[in-house]
């Protein structure tokens, strides 16, 4: 909260210059129109005039007006080019400025600065060695990571038999749990255009996460949040229709670039997975309350 915000300062500065350019362009347009309009009567007078001296005077006035119009047009072209450049930079910055965070959120460079907000139940520590999750799955012949590695490389796996059925059952449970909470179930597109990607994440995040379809303006989603939020791009919502409470299922695809060292064993850091998501579109003043409801839904779904 106390950090310097150079990007915010820059966008404010660029916005002020952009508005000044707009103002100057409008002023020049008005002056150009006035001069062009003034030439009409002068041409009429010139056509009817027999006095050579008067004709020369009228022609000189017309030429002066035309020269002024030309000068205004050249200046307008410069200003409009600057205006476009400023607008592009403003948009670039706006894509990278995140939402405001709650004052209670701890500030720090990484997740080691996180604090425990609330605890539900107490962890049970058994008196025997705890097998790793993939060891349990392998004991049921429920996972084949070696074959997946040969087929697609690291970060993929086959689920088999009852483990595959359990996977589907958990997804169905999560879906029905949210539907019972009054959320509308949605299956969104699993790909999206680049402008939607830019609207939901920064370029460094996009580069680290997203798979791009070669030769197409399409990206595989890293989470259904992307297309769920993208559904409202360029839309104005009726406040009376809020809140919109939505729950979505999707497969998710992530490069996991730069994630090395963050629990790489097993099926944590993988390139393909499925999940159930919660999305609420609400009034800003209701955001904190909905956040509380959403994380409580996550806890209760696991009880």
Q: Language-model segments: which ranges?
A:
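TRNA-recognition modules of translation machinery and tRNA-sensing kinases, especially anticodon-binding
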Residues: 119-302
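N-terminal alpha-helical targeting/anchoring segments
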Residues: 1-123, 138, 142
């Amino acid at each position: 909260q106390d950090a310097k915000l150079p990007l915010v300062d820059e966008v404010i500065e660029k916005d002020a210059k952009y508005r000044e350019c707009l103002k100057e362009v409008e002023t020049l347009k008005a002056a150009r129109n006035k001069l062009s309009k003034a030439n009409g009567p002068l041409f009429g007078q010139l056509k009817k005039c027999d006095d050579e001296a008067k004709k020369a005077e009228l022609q000189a006035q017309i030429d002066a007006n035309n020269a002024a119009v030309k000068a205004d047009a050249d200046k307008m072209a410069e200003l409009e080019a600057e205006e476009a450049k400023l607008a592009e930079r403003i948009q670039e910055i706006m894509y990278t400025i995140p939402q405001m965070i709650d004052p209670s959120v701890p500030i720090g460079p990484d997740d080691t600065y996180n604090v425990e907000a609330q605890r539900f139940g107490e962890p049970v520590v058994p008196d025997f060695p705890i097998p790793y999750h993939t060891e349990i799955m392998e004991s049921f012949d429920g996972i084949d990571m070696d074959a997946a590695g040969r087929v697609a490389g690291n970060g993929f796996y086959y689920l088999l038999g009852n483990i595959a059925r359990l996977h589907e059952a958990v997804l169905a449970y999560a879906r029905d749990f949210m539907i019972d909470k009054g959320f509308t179930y949605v299956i969104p597109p699993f790909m999206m255009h680049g402008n939607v990607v830019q609207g939901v994440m920064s370029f460094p995040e996009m580069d680290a996460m997203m798979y791009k379809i070669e030769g197409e303006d399409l990206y595989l989603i890293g989470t259904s949040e992307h297309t769920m939020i993208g559904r409202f791009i360029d839309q104005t919502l009726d406040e009376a229709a809020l809140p919109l409470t939505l729950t979505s299922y999707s497969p998710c695809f992530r490069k996991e670039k730069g994630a090395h060292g963050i629990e790489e064993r097993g099926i944590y850091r993988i390139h393909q997975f499925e999940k159930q998501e919660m999305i609420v579109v609400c009034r800003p003043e209701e955001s904190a309350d909905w956040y509380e409801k959403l994380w409580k839904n996550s806890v209760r779904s696991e009880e």
